[in-house]
Swiss-Prot record:
Its EC number is 1.17.7.3. [4Fe-4S] cluster binds at residues 280, 283, 315, 322. Binds 1 [4Fe-4S] cluster. One of its GO terms (molecular function) is 4 iron, 4 sulfur cluster binding. It comes from Frankia casuarinae (strain DSM 45818 / CECT 9043 / HFP020203 / CcI3). This is 4-hydroxy-3-methylbut-2-en-1-yl diphosphate synthase (flavodoxin). It is an enzyme of class 1 (oxidoreductase).
Length: 384
């Protein structure tokens, strides 16, 4: 019997073809079409507190946020929009519920876009004509943001609960009202707390229209739970080519939402990777404290912008192989660490010097990469 070893003949399945969608401008950020998938977040400050809101927007911008949303539940908040929109370094979307008058206030204030919730704005259907005319005159797109928790009562009566079909019908109905007034500068979201329902709703929507889609799992929960839900839902849809902009909803500081959203895009190859740390989960073979080592290396390299892969490995099983695959890596054991740079062992250091040596080598490689402008194959750091 002949046994042939080698790679499987079937190629890896690529991500799905990007869904065709019309393109809109949210300020200076393109959404839809062939534009990169953008990352959004939402301020947790009182919008009426202009300074606090602008300070949080600055933090979000520094973390990589491209579009920010602010809540407008009161007249004081509406009055603050002009100053915020004027001074914000990234496009500002006004989030409107209940009162249609705030939609007009947001447009007049110079917001880059307005999100409306058709499920709870008073007499919304009757106001669509006025909203469409005002938004069209100002060049302001409208996001029709359908949420499971505030679905129109007529649809709840029809479907019994917030099903994928109910969410989709709500969005398409409101789109049709805007279309009657020749307004199509629209993007849509159909959010649900259950990732499975959310995925099904967006699939239906993607087949039914060509508007750009804003992905989100509403009320996703605390940081860990919300990260898992969003990663599952966004990963499934983006892998199918569905989704043009994302917002990870977490019961956590908004900057954390941006970090998670960016990481999801990077993991799918939809955003150029920066620093990536790969580490093993540890086991009885590990001869170093992998957790501490990985955390120390990660902290020491935080903020690095170049696409560097660093591998921190704790034993001799996968350690040397993983380290060789990375730009920089360490394979640890017997109180020592072998330092690999682009596949070659360059030195062996005592365990106490591993972190310091890795950081020094990473900084040196980063300077080289920045100088010659040639990124590595993939930015990542591996710890195993």
């Amino acid at each position: 019997m002949t046994v042939t070893l080698g790679m499987p003949t079937a190629p890896a399945r690529p991500l799905g073809t990007r869904r065709h969608s019309r393109q809109i401008h949210v300020g200076n950020v393109l959404v839809g079409g062939d534009a990169p998938v953008s990352v959004q977040s939402m301020c947790t400050t009182l919008t009426s507190d202009v300074n606090a809101t602008l300070q949080q927007i600055a933090q979000l911008t520094a973390s990589g946020c491209q579009i920010v949303r602010v809540a407008v539940p009161s007249q004081d908040d509406a009055d603050a929009l002009a100053a915020i929109a004027r001074k914000s370094p990234i496009p500002v979307i006004a989030d409107i519920h209940f009162q249609p008058k705030y939609v007009f206030a947001a447009i007049d204030a110079g917001c880059a876009a307005v999100r409306v919730n058709p499920g709870n704005i008073k007499a919304f259907d009757d106001k669509v004509g006025e909203i469409a005319r005002a938004a069209k005159a100002a060049g302001v797109p409208i996001r029709i943001g359908v949420n499971a928790g505030s679905l129109d009562k007529r649809l709840l009566a029809k479907y019994g609960k917030a099903t994928p079909e109910a969410l989709t019908e709500s969005a398409l109905w409101e789109c049709s009202l805007f279309e009657e007034h020749d307004f199509r500068d629209i993007k849509i979201s159909v959010k649900h707390h259950d990732p499975v329902v959310m995925i099904q709703a967006y699939r239906l929507l993607a087949q039914a229209c060509d508007y750009p889609l804003h992905l989100g799992v509403t009320e996703a929960g605390p940081s860990f739970q919300g990260t898992v839900k969003s990663a599952v839902a966004f990963g499934a849809l983006l892998a199918e080519g569905i989704g043009d902009t994302i917002r990870v909803s977490l019961s956590a500081p908004p900057v954390e939402e941006v970090k998670v959203g960016t990481a999801i895009l990077e993991s799918l190859g939809l955003r150029q990777r920066k620093l990536e740390i790969v580490s093993c989960p540890s086991c009885g073979r590990a001869q170093v404290d992998v957790y501490t080592l990985a955390n120390q290396v990660s902290a020491g390299l935080e903020g690095m912008e170049v696409p560097l892969r660093v591998a921190v490995m704790g034993c001799v099983v996968n350690g040397p192989g993983e380290a060789r695959e990375a730009d920089l890596g360490v394979a640890s054991g017997n109180g020592k660490g072998q330092i690999f740079v682009r596949g070659e062992v360059v030195k062996t250091v005592p365990e106490a010097q591993i972190v310091e040596t890795l950081i020094e080598e990473a900084m040196r490689l980063a300077e080289e990469m920045a100088a010659d402008g040639t990124p590595s194959g993939e930015p990542s750091v591996s710890v195993g």
